[in-house]
């Protein structure tokens, strides 16, 4: 196997250009999630692919949230959220939650249940992680929210929605 030469970033080279970084990150396939919250500060939701497991003891995941997002002040003030991982047929819902659509219209487009934290659980999601935000860190334009998982709701699903190459793709388990 022959590897293509890559540009490196170090104290001796030019910094990585933002567009090059974004193009490279587009090659990283990721599950598509709708992050939801409900509480004293209101109800909000947004689409995210920057979600991953941190540890299973205690069960913790992280969610990256742009501080300029309309959902940011609501999510952080509520201190709780639900990560709803989408099935292949839910790409339209992903687009709705990823745009500028008013929150009430986003939530009206699907059926929801309520988790132990009070956050909305998406009916038909492949899995929902109901979480309490335990702490956060700010990096660049985003906050990294570390979330302790309080409950997991799994559904029988044979496919998932992933984002790769700036496009949605259905991923089947077969």
Swiss-Prot record:
Pfam families given in the database record: Flavin_Reduct
Catalyzed chemical reaction(s): FMNH2 + NAD(+) = FMN + NADH + 2 H(+)
Per the record, the domain of life is Bacteria
Q: Which GO terms describe its molecular function?
A: FMN binding; FMN reductase (NADH) activity; FMN reductase [NAD(P)H] activity; riboflavin reductase (NADPH) activity
**What keywords would UniProt list here?**
Flavoprotein, FMN, NAD, Oxidoreductase
Q: Name one GO biological process term.
A: uracil catabolic process
Q: Does the keyword Membrane apply?
A: no
Tell me which family the UniProt entry assigns to this protein.
Answer: Belongs to the non-flavoprotein flavin reductase family. RutF subfamily.
What's this chain's function? Catalyzes the reduction of FMN to FMNH2 which is used to reduce pyrimidine by RutA via the Rut pathway.
Q: What is this protein called?
A: FMN reductase (NADH) RutF
Organism of provenance: Stutzerimonas stutzeri (strain A1501) (Pseudomonas stutzeri)
The gene is rutF
